[in-house]
């Protein structure tokens, strides 16, 4: 219960105000979490409105099942399954899609989930602990090259190769030391390699982020759900995405810009601008948490919210 109370939804009012443009529409919350955005969306919907939420985390599903509202339903799956899941429910078009990316405070603050380097726990990091390969299982088999690529590309860590070598060297000692299966030991290994210090950031931050992204296929799933959202949005429907690190935000920014721009055409060709297809999206805005919100919830500091609207049928 304590963890539930600690979670604060970032950009709550701003996101829901941007999302809900038609109170009787069908909306999707791709990341239910602990339900902050979903409850606020339901409060704005008319009796004929509908909200379908997604989450991989079994604890999020438990929380969602406590919402007694006929307009609401929850899907225990990744938002990457959105297109098929909505089709199975007879939904062809929606009025808005909300994505609040990253991990929630209850996930980070629970050592048993293995997301945090601040408290020792099992090295898991899966959003859904019942499916897929845990961080410990992946670390037990990954090559130096694969480890380097993941830590470099998903953590933007300049010491990726050195960290990868240290992890493989530790694995060679498994017969004597046992498997590398705790967050505390992983953080310690990284700390011994990363000698430089970024102000206010633990040396293990980038490596933990990278492994979490890899284990959960976060960036691949994000690209899938953005494509799905574009095809599902009705004319006038909104796509609202809140991201918390540069890799996510870069993907969202490029996606929105690509679909809000007219297609490139060779100027030497006899094609008029009016003959080109209209881009499907219009970028509405980019927003950041207020100083007051960041003061109340420091984890909101890195949040960026991007909003786009479908302008073509």
Curated annotation (Swiss-Prot):
Keywords: Cytoplasm, Methyltransferase, rRNA processing, S-adenosyl-L-methionine, Transferase. It is an enzyme of class 2 (transferase). It catalyses: cytidine(1402) in 16S rRNA + S-adenosyl-L-methionine = N(4)-methylcytidine(1402) in 16S rRNA + S-adenosyl-L-homocysteine + H(+). Disulfide bonds: none annotated. One of its GO terms (cellular component) is cytoplasm. Pfam families: Methyltransf_5. Coiled coil: none annotated. S-adenosyl-L-methionine binds at residues 35-37, 55, 79, 100, 107. GO terms for biological process: rRNA base methylation. InterPro entries: RsmH, SAM-dep_MeTrfase_MraW_recog, SAM-dependent_MTases_sf. The keyword Translocase does not apply. One of its GO terms (molecular function) is rRNA (cytosine-N4-)-methyltransferase activity. It is found in: Cytoplasm. Specifically methylates the N4 position of cytidine in position 1402 (C1402) of 16S rRNA. Belongs to the methyltransferase superfamily. RsmH family. This is Ribosomal RNA small subunit methyltransferase H. It comes from Burkholderia lata (strain ATCC 17760 / DSM 23089 / LMG 22485 / NCIMB 9086 / R18194 / 383). The gene is rsmH.
